[in-house]
Amino acid sequence: MHSSREPVFLAKTRRRQAVIAGALIAIIFFAFPALAQEANVYRQVLGLDSRKVVWFLAQMHLFFGAFVLGVPLFAVIIEIVGWRSNDQRYDKLAYEFTSLLSVAYATTAAFGGMLAFALFSLYPTFMGYMASTFKDVMFVYALLFFAETFALYIYYYGWNAMQNRTPYSARLQMIFKTIGVALFVVTVLFFFDIIGWKMRGDTRVFMALLYLLPMSIGFYLMKDLKSTHIFIGITLNVVGTAIMQAANSMAGFMMSPAGVNEAGALTDHVWVAFENILATPIAVHRMLGNLAFGGLVAGSYAAVKFIGSKNQAEKAHYDWMGYIANLVAVAALIPLPFAGYYLGREVYSNSAVMGNNMMGGDFSWTFIIQALLVGSIFLITNYYLWSGMTRIPGSDRYYKYIKYILFAICVSFAVWLTPHNLPLTGQEVSEMGGSQYHPTLKFLGLMPAKNAVINLIILATFFSFLLYRRGNKSDIVPISQQGRAPIVVISLA
């Protein structure tokens, strides 16, 4: 079905491998001279501020990385649905979602190499400290990249070759099922803290549900070449999640250091520093964010392809692709604020000063901009659902509810954006009557009000999605119009 594209893909593969290899060589070549510099030597590049350069590269790396980690999560699930239902439409859809990774993966690696080069060149002392603290983790981190690349290319380029559904021998199937059951038992014991090393409860749940459980399911399902391909996809997601958790743990250590003394020297096992208080909350938040981001980008791709389609069959396919992508995005977007609350709670429990700086101090306006973007995402998502309803025959009976949902979202959005106070100068405070708080609106800036309205926005989005789902459902016939024949038949029975 896709074999005609293979030579082009193989050529692209060689180019991507060359890009990745070049990035790794550049990192190695420039890292050692950077580490050889004197302490606290921080420099600019091309006259640009070093912080802005690192921020830009990190942000671009996160954008593409979120897409690369998010798309395989739902692509494998769609492939499993197609495999179990024997419906080639789902298999084709999963392949098309996966094909979007071909360019994004190489770009992610390129920006990752540039980010590493910028960090080691512009902040050699800091990166030297991080490398000495997490030297064991960094080697595992690099090996995980090789494992992810290997799994991704086998998963993508082996799609056609691994379509055979001829069952393996009964003995081989029994071996795989035994491994799956044994791994599931280990998962249960690990989940309830019966086995395994000491760790926080959220980290234990994260690793049990996203590492051990998927692998046990993958082994148990393996019975033919197609299910083996699905297992490779599951492995790809597990390795990608491990890469994300490793990066998040090192980022969390920068904000909530653990396992070190006042001088910053490691006093305990590196696992204590790795499993800091913010490591898992960031991982959970990013996991949902990656899934929502991947779904929205894939939906945008489907929308563009829908516009450029030449016939009704293609339009129907890409309309369905956009529907599935939007379903994934909404499913991840709805619990995302709760993951953000969880992360914020852990930030305040670790350092109230850091939390106050984020929400009411130096970064208060940045936090307001973030709130604006979060509210905009929900508003745009609802608008996408409403516009999608216009293409569904029979959904016009639900149009009357849209204005009420829109009103609730707009009012909630306004409350969500209302700040409790603003960082003002002395002159501005005196012009406001000696107070930096609005006499009425200050109450809308408190978290109880914001918690209420964000929950209302989430419920409104969920209600819009329910209307979108029920758009093509037929009306239920009232009992008064059904006649008495069913009643008589039931009574006779």
Protein language model regions, located:
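Polytopic transmembrane helical bundles with strong interfacial aromatic enrichment
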Residues: 32-493
